[in-house]
């Protein structure tokens, strides 16, 4: 029996990725009544844990982090009103492969070694839900993590395969970050810090070096989604991933375990890679992932 939604489906590698890059988009479309499904490929077992409370859960200790991150993902999706988690192949089918060059990639369940089974699992989801919009990663997986790169390949292959088996996804996007917007907000943080103004860099954090945060040239971005009205939901979702993310007291930035400040942007960015581009605004970009599709997004 089909449970087709015609909504938005996003494919992410680990718990927290859905919030960092697309949390505002999820919250915006849910606020408009659009069905949203987040498919997560691993449990994020190899993540570095912030603080001492849950440090013993790490992969090199009790190796229980993945189970706890299911809870964090559940809380984050609840904050975004996106429903319960959905894991590719079922929770625990594939394991976090770790950063490039680490031994964790040799684990028999490492996602980088998932093969055709992962593609088929996602095809089944696409044929079941028949989303009108799918969001995945670019070929570099954003910042080059092996699981992100694998998620890109799995999503791309699954979208193509689903088209041959009855559901041609109308619009397929990559989630990216606009380099100009990232620089604008990072420079604003630097000025606040230098002047000792409210919202300065938290103690122990540092500003990102040039090209340290993943981003793409602004002229490659096709679509901007305004998420300013739902930033409270995105911040709540970021805080839900407490083993991985710290949100600054100002709420304007967050940091991973490396303490590099990343801005919580008022917009999220995409590149349309499959489907017809919809009507554009004065900036030459779409401002709705469903732009140009028949019927409203809500």
Curated annotation (Swiss-Prot):
Region Disordered: which residues? 277-298
Task: List the molecular function annotations (GO) for this entry.
Answer: N-acetylglucosaminylinositol deacetylase activity; zinc ion binding
Q: Which residues form a coiled coil?
A: none
This entry's Enzyme Commission designation comes to: 3.5.1.103
Top-rank taxon, per record: Bacteria
Residues at which Zn(2+) binds: 14, 17, 148
**Which family does the entry's similarity section mention?**
Belongs to the MshB deacetylase family.
The protein's name is 1D-myo-inositol 2-acetamido-2-deoxy-alpha-D-glucopyranoside deacetylase
Species name: Nocardia farcinica (strain IFM 10152)
Organism lineage reads as: Bacteria, Bacillati, Actinomycetota, Actinomycetes, Mycobacteriales
Point out the gene that encodes the protein.
Answer: mshB
């Amino acid at each position: 029996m089909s449970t087709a939604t015609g909504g938005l489906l996003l494919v992410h590698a680990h718990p927290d990725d859905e919030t960092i890059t697309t949390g505002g988009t999820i919250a915006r479309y849910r606020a408009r009544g659009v069905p949203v499904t987040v498919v997560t490929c691993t449990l994020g077992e190899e993540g570095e844990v912030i603080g001492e409370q849950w440090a013993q859960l790490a992969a090199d200790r009790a190796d229980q982090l993945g189970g706890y991150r299911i809870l964090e993902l559940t809380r984050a999706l609840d904050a975004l009103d996106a429903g319960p988690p959905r894991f590719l192949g079922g929770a625990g089918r594939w394991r976090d492969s770790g950063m490039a060059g680490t031994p964790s990639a040799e684990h028999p369940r490492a996602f980088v070694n998932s093969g055709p089974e992962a593609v088929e699992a996602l095809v089944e989801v696409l044929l079941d839900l028949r989303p009108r919009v799918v969001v995945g990663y670019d070929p570099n997986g954003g910042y080059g993590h092996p699981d992100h790169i694998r998620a890109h390949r799995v999503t791309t292959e699954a979208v193509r395969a689903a088209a041959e088996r009855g559901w041609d996804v109308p619009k397929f996007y990559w989630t990216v970050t606009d380099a100009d917007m990232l620089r604008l907000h990072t420079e604003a943080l630097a000025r606040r810090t230098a002047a000792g103004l409210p919202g300065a860099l938290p103690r122990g954090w540092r500003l990102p070096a040039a090209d340290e945060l993943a981003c793409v040239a602004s002229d490659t971005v096709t679509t901007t989604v305004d998420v300013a009205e739902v930033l409270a939901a995105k911040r709540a979702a970021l805080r839900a991933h407490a083993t991985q993310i710290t949100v600054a007291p100002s709420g304007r930035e967050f940091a991973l375990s490396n303490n590099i400040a990343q801005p919580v942007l008022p917009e999220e960015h995409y590149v349309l890679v499959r489907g017809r581009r919809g009507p554009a605004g004065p900036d030459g970009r779409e401002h709705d992932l469903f732009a140009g599709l028949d019927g409203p997004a809500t």
